[in-house]
Amino acid sequence: MRDGDYRAANDVDLIISAGGDRGILDYFHKVVTDSAPVLGIYESDSTGFLAQLDVRDLEASLVRIDKGNFEIDQVFRIAVRVDGREVEPVLNDVAVFPSKSATLMEHVLRIDEKTVWRDNSDGLILSTPTGSTAYSMSAGGPMVLQKSQVFVVVSVNSLDNTRRPLIIPNDTTVEVADIVSRYHCEIVLDGGTRMGIKKSLQCSKHEVPAKLVRLSGNSSIISVIAKKVRLAEDLLSMPPSAKLLLKTLEYEGALSQRDLSTRTMLPERTVRLALRHLLTRGYVKKKTSLRDARQRIYELKL
């Protein structure tokens, strides 16, 4: 969509978003005002959480929508300010990490201007209930039902063994301040957009929710959580390299084998064996890169 199309997003009855969950996340980054409900579709060999409609079922589903056989879920977003500057809102999560992996980051967490902790960790994630089954969960956070009006705060791999994730009301203001690391730190919005940060991150509930079309009979948050629980049980028997690749793909999106080796600092042979394990288990799929037909990329199939 062009910028003008985004501004007219409330002048139509329905918006269809291709590209799976990433397409929906990108759309709601651009639209900060009220929008028509969004129907997300995904490729036939994948599944989605936000996008729950197989592209093969699109024609039949439009007939159901025309008859009014659908519901609209309103899910809240996070308003984000980086060093005092407002940036695009997020639907899943906002994370702050050092630009170099396996590097500690000092920070102070404040809620409604009151200091909750001072911590040294690999980073921090603030998620909505919608995002609680994404990167937040893989970092040790809880799974939260989508209609809950809460934020989830996770300090990733804290040096303090007693540090636990926080669940707080979403009418609070969350600030991550006094950020210090050996390397410059970055904000990551919904696992995609990155930008530098110097000192502080402020988050609050965005005044305009996202509207998502749900067709009756489609997978619910309960079934998604059940699938995530089965994955968590399977993770116990996975080699550490496979777990790391899963987390990296969830955080970074689709990557080539070489990219995975660079991001995780694992030898290419180890990455190759871990990918074979994940492909066999059905957690990852391999596809041809649209940028280079000779290159194969890997992405989650959850």
Across the structure, where does each feature detected by a protein language model lie?
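Short, cationic-aromatic polyanion-contact patches
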Residues: L235-A242, S256, K287-L302
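A short, conserved structural fragment
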Residues: L279-S289
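ATP/NTP phosphate-donor binding region
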Residues: M1-A18, G23-I24, F28-T33, Q52-D73, ...
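Flexible coil/turn residues that form the inter-helical turn or adjacent wing/linker of helix-turn-helix
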Residues: G253
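ATP/nucleoside-binding phosphotransfer catalytic cores, i.e., glycine-rich phosphate-binding loops
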Residues: D83, E88, V96, D112-V116, ...
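Gly/Ser/Thr-rich active-site loops/lids in small-molecule metabolic enzymes
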Residues: R118-D122, L126-T162
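Catalytic core of DAGKc-family lipid kinases
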Residues: S44-D122
